[in-house]
C-alpha cells in the first residue's frame, strides 16, 4: 500500500515535468515567475468555494459548519492521490464520524455530497462545452455523461428502494455472500433518502452551482470572458472524473484546449497548490481507527455501532 501511495504522490509532478520537457518549457522558471496576484486569486476563490460548499455539506450531514469545511478541504487533498470514493469521500466520512461516531452514516452522507459535486459539475460542462468545442472534448463528454447517468440512476434507486424489500437485491446479496452487509446497505439507503428532499435538492444544487462559479473567477485574470472561464474550470473538473491521481495527463490535455503550454503548466501548479492545502489537516483523519473499523466490516460485516443498536 505504501508503494502505491508513493507512486500516486509522484505521478502528478512527474506528468507536469514531462509535459514541460515535451514543450520545451523551463519548469523552474515558471515557478519563479509565478504571478503573485494569480496565486492569491486561485487560493482565495478555492477557499471561498469550499466555504460555500461547507454550508451545503453541513446541511446534509448535520455536523458543525467548520467540521464540514475541514472535511471538504481535507477530502480534496486526499483525492489528489486516491481517486474516487476511497479517496475524498471516505476522507470526509472519517472526519464526520469523529463527530457523530457513525462511519456508515457518515460515508452514506459523504456520497450524497458527491452526488451534487458530480452531477451539477457535469451538467455545467455539458451545457457550456459548445462555447469552444474541440475533438478532445469527446473524452470529457463521455466522462461527464457517464457520471450523470450513473449517479442519477444509482441515487434514484437508493431513494426509491429505501425501507423496501427488493427481492432481486436480496438474491444478489445472497449470491455474492454479503448477507452480513445487508443491514449496513439498508442503513446507508435510509440516510441518503432522509438527506434528499425536494427542498434539499434545489438548495444544495444552487449552492454547488454557486461554488463552481466562484471558483471560476480566478481564470478571469487570464481570460476576461466569464462564460469561457467557467467552461475552463468545468473542463478541469471533467478531467477529475477520470480515476487517475490528480487527473494527471487528462487535466493538462483539457487545459491545452484553451491555453499555451506555459500557461497550462502554471495553472496545473496553482491547482495542485490549492488542493494540497488540505494536507495541513491530515491529522483530522484517524487512520488507525478507520482501518480498525473497516477490518471489522471485512471480517464480520458489522461495525462497533451496528445499525440495529
Model-derived regions: residue spans:
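Membrane-interface alpha-helices at helix entry/exit sites of multi-pass transporters
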Residues: 69-70, 84, 88-89, 99-115, ...
Amino acid at each position: 500500500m505504501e508503494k502505491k501511495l508513493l507512486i500516486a504522490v509522484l505521478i502528478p509532478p512527474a506528468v507536469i515535468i514531462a509535459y514541460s520537457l515535451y514543450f520545451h518549457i523551463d519548469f523552474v522558471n515558471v515557478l519563479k515567475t509565478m504571478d503573485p496576484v494569480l496565486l492569491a486569486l486561485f487560493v482565495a476563490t478555492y477557499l471561498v468555494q469550499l466555504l460555500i460548499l461547507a454550508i451545503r455539506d453541513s446541511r446534509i450531514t448535520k455536523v458543525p459548519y467548520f467540521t464540514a469545511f475541514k472535511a471538504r478541504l481535507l477530502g480534496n487533498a486526499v483525492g489528489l492521490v486516491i481517486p474516487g470514493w476511497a479517496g475524498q469521500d471516505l476522507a470526509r466520512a472519517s472526519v464526520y464520524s469523529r463527530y457523530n461516531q457513525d462511519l456508515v452514516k457518515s460515508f452514506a452522507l459523504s456520497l450524497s455530497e458527491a452526488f451534487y459535486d458530480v452531477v451539477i459539475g457535469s451538467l455545467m460542462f455539458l451545457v457550456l462545452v459548445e462555447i469552444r468545442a474541440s475533438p478532445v472534448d469527446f473524452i470529457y463528454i463521455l466522462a461527464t455523461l457517464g457520471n450523470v447517468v450513473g449517479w442519477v440512476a444509482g441515487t434514484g434507486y437508493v431513494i426509491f428502494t429505501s425501507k423496501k424489500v427488493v427481492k432481486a437485491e436480496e438474491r444478489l446479496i445472497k449470491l455474492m455472500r454479503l448477507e452480513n452487509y445487508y443491514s449496513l446497505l439498508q442503513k446507508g439507503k435510509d440516510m441518503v433518502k432522509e438527506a434528499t428532499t425536494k427542498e434539499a435538492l434545489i438548495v444544495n444544487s444552487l449552492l454547488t452551482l454557486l461554488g463552481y462559479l466562484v471558483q471560476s473567477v480566478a481564470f478571469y485574470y487570464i481570460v476576461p470572458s466569464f462564460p469561457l472561464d467557467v467552461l475552463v474550470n468545468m473542463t478541469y473538473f471533467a478531467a477529475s472524473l477520470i480515476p487517475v491521481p490528480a487527473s494527471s495527463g487528462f487535466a493538462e490535455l483539457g487545459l491545452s484546449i484553451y491555453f499555451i503550454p506555459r500557461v497550462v503548466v502554471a495553472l496545473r501548479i496553482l491547482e495542485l497548490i490549492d488542493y494540497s492545502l488540505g494536507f495541513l489537516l491530515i491529522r483530522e483523519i484517524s487512520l488507525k481507527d478507520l482501518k480498525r473499523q473497516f477490518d471489522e466490516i471485512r471480517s464480520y460485516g458489522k461495525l462497533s455501532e451496528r445499525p440495529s443498536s
